[in-house]
Amino acid sequence: MARIELLPRVYGSYKANLHCHTTYSDGNLSPEQVKEHYKANGYSVVAFTDHNVLIDHSALNDKDFLALVGLEVDTDSFLYGKKHEFNQTCHLCAILRDPARAVPVYRAEQYTGKAISAKIDEFHQNGYIVNYNHPTWSCEGADEFLHYGRFDGMELFNYSAEVANNNGYSHGEYALALRLMNHRIRCIAADDNHNGYDCEDDSCGGWVVFKAPELSYETIIKAYDDMCFYSSTGPEIKQCYIEDGVFVLDCSPV
């Protein structure tokens, strides 16, 4: 039986943070400081996803660093007419597939499955990838996200939520989504960094490693689409393949 490479070894590895905040919203580092900090820690890619504002930081790009253009939109139950004991909220990271095609899309203004699903559709129609963020932190469960339509990825791990509130893991929610939503959902680990105390406060704790032939906007988006990446909070995956019906994973110590 032919060997099936799940992470092509001939490709380069590009470490990425797909959820990041700067001084353009509620973060404490400038985009330039974010780039400096993440490059120093071995990252090649950062998606700049400030709250409800789309800003192109491609001026930060160099041969070893790529800024993805995106934003995080949030719809709170408290603000939009649905009262709960806890303030439920839906946060979505939307990342442009083509930074030259930047069409602003704003958050849903009703906290309903129908409104949020329509907003995800609008993002897709305007050339965005959509990741559903930190459901555990958001106090959301299957009753909510099963009505959100076809988001592309879900944060299985959010480092900022884990550091601040011990609720950054969303294993159960991800398992339910895979079983019940009838489409492939990418598994994302991300920082959601705000750097409120120092650079290390909520940075470099959860990441994605893309496998791509080179570092460019197009190749990283293609790697996302093709699921040619893995998410981690520590171990490095060196090989991942299926051979003779056996799944083989070679990684650094866990």
Label each PLM-derived region with a short phrase.
Residues G172-R179, S216:
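Functionally critical loop-and-helix segments that line ligand-binding/catalytic clefts
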Residues M1-R9, S13, N182-R186, N193-V254:
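C-terminal functional module detector
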Residues K39-S44, L180-H183, D225:
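Sec-exported extracytoplasmic/periplasmic mature domains
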